[in-house]
């Protein structure tokens, strides 16, 4: 009898473990976007006075400039973000480097090429050439001295693209266009990938790293080198199989060009060229691809098995300015485009996301708060009136943001934005790959979710006033038309 019962008991135990594991997977899947592995601030923070920021320092390189925001300000230190704005001139090359935090780059202007180098990935871009008969005869004798150009995949970017750069991944950038590249870089220092102290560190593979280190008062202002500069010439030449002279060149001891250098005759790169139609098709396909990946993850669970998308094939850039990709659109108010880990899978690695908002003349956003992220708002066009309120009901910011200014909005703080007469566009870079907001008005808002009696008793108003409060903006989502235009539209609807 015991031998008969054992398989039954064993089967029951296995079934229990299977069900328990499936339940745990479902629970983790449903709560993953609410949770974050991001570290909090090690200091006590008081977000009682927010301010608009502009760069406080500009450092000139040979072929561009790097503009730094005030990293010593409490808002940057408490939210754990580091922000720079770079201008790369035509034929300018941002030297290869990596940092200790994950970074999102938004391209405000221009176009160019970038090349993140993922460890362990093959050099899939290879140069093909024909050999002469003499070369073929000598091939066996000089095989070790014959090389061809090969490198990892390079990525073209343009205005409106968001480029994701994981922590510790070396990358470079080159401007092959006719106009300067202007881009805003936001690095999340409190990202779980950073196991160093909570401050930004750039590790340059070339040039002299004299720029970023000077932002910290307790860092030496001289003798800053690239990572090769700390090795002895003998060990470096032996490790890389090069001469001592070349090893000294790698250390760039007398290189005063800065982090953006000029390539006089342009870069010669192995790259495929796509037609305009192919580029447009790629935008649509990338959107569909992200949605398909999300649906597959919903079916398979939140645990990654490493086969869905590897380092070597993942996309590192996605356009967020294309009107055809808008998630919310109001022809009288504007549009909103979300870029999260569901659409752009690499964001799950960098643990950040982006939102692009275009508001028309005098349009406004529904009051909202960020549920699971801090938000770095950068104005790209126009002006906007912005108010932010903290947990005590205190107005911690009430002012106008204009083009080129930046505002950090802490998690859970309630914000309202209204475009001025010329309209407004901004990019919001957030510290969660699946950032969520809670709206206070319109469709899917907190008021619409509350019963009439709860609203009436909470604010000591009548039921009729409560219903009006819930449904006044009931046909709009996210972006609202100006009050005069909205009333006119309501009057037309009623008369019709």
UniProtKB/Swiss-Prot annotation:
Disulfide-linked positions: 45-78, 121-312
Q: Does the keyword Calcium apply?
A: no
Signal peptide location: 1-24
Q: Which residues form the Cupin type-1 domain?
A: 50-248, 318-467
Note the superkingdom of the native organism. Answer: Eukaryota
Q: Which GO terms describe its biological process?
A: seed development
The answer to keyword Disulfide bond applying to this record is: yes
Q: Which GO terms describe its molecular function?
A: nutrient reservoir activity
Q: Which UniProt keyword terms apply here?
A: Disulfide bond, Seed storage protein, Signal, Storage protein
Q: Which family does it belong to?
A: Belongs to the 11S seed storage protein (globulins) family.
Quaternary structure, per UniProt, is: Hexamer; each subunit is composed of an acidic and a basic chain derived from a single precursor and linked by a disulfide bond.
This chain's protein is named: Glutelin type-A 3
Q: In the record, what lineage is assigned to the organism producing the protein?
A: Eukaryota, Viridiplantae, Streptophyta, Embryophyta, Tracheophyta
């Amino acid at each position: 009898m015991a031998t008969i019962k054992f398989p039954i008991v064993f089967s029951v135990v296995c079934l229990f473990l299977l069900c328990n594991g499936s339940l745990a997977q479902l629970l983790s899947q449903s709560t993953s976007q609410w949770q974050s592995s991001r570290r909090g601030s090690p200091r006590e923070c008081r977000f009682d006075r927010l301010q608009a920021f502009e760069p406080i320092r500009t450092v000139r390189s040979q072929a561009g400039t790097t503009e730094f925001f005030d990293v010593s300000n409490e808002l940057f230190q408490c939210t754990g973000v580091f922000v720079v704005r770079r201008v790369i001139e035509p034929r300018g090359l941002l030297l290869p480097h990596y940092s200790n935090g994950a970074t999102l780059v938004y391209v405000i202007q221009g176009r160019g090429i970038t090349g993140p180098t993922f460890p362990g990935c093959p050099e899939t871009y290879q140069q093909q050439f024909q050999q002469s008969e003499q070369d073929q005869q000598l091939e066996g004798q000089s095989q070790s001295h014959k090389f061809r150009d090969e490198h990892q995949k390079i990525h073209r970017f343009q205005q409106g693209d968001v480029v994701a750069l994981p922590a510790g991944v070396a990358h470079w950038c080159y401007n092959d266009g006719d106009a300067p590249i202007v881009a805003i870089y936001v690095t999340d220092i409190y990202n779980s990938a950073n196991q160093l102290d909570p401050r930004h560190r750039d590790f340059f593979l070339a040039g002299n790293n004299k720029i970023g280190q000077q932002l910290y008062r307790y860092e030496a202002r001289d003798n800053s080198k690239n990572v090769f500069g700390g090795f002895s010439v003998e060990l470096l030449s032996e490790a890389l199989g090069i001469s001592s002279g070349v090893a000294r060149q790698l250390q760039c001891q007398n290189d005063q060009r800065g982090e953006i250098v000029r390539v006089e005759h342009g870069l010669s790169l192995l790259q495929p060229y796509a037609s305009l139609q192919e580029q447009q098709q790629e935008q649509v396909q990338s959107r569909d691809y992200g949605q398909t990946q999300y649906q597959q993850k919903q079916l398979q669970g939140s645990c990654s098995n490493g086969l869905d998308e590897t380092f070597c094939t993942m996309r590192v850039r996605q356009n967020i300015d294309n009107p055809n990709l808008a998630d919310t659109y109001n022809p009288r108010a504007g549009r909103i485009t979300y870029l999260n880990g569901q659409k752009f899978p690499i964001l799950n690695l960098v643990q950040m996301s982006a939102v692009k908002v275009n508001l028309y003349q005098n349009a406004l956003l529904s009051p909202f708060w960020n549920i699971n992220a801090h938000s770095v708002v950068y104005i790209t066009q126009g002006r906007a009136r912005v108010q932010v309120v903290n947990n005590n009901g205190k107005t911690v910011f009430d002012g106008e943001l204009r083009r080129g200014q930046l505002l950090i909005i802490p998690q859970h703080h309630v914000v309202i934005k209204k475009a001025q007469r010329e309209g407004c566009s901004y990019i919001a870079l957030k510290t969660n790959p699946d950032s969520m907001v809670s709206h206070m008005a319109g469709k899917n808002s907190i008021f619409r979710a509350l019963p009439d009696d709860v609203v009436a008793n909470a604010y000591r108003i009548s039921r009729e006033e409560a219903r009006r409060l819930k449904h006044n903006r009931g046909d709009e989502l996210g972006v609202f038309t100006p009050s005069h235009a909205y009333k006119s539209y309501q009057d037309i609807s009623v008369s019709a």
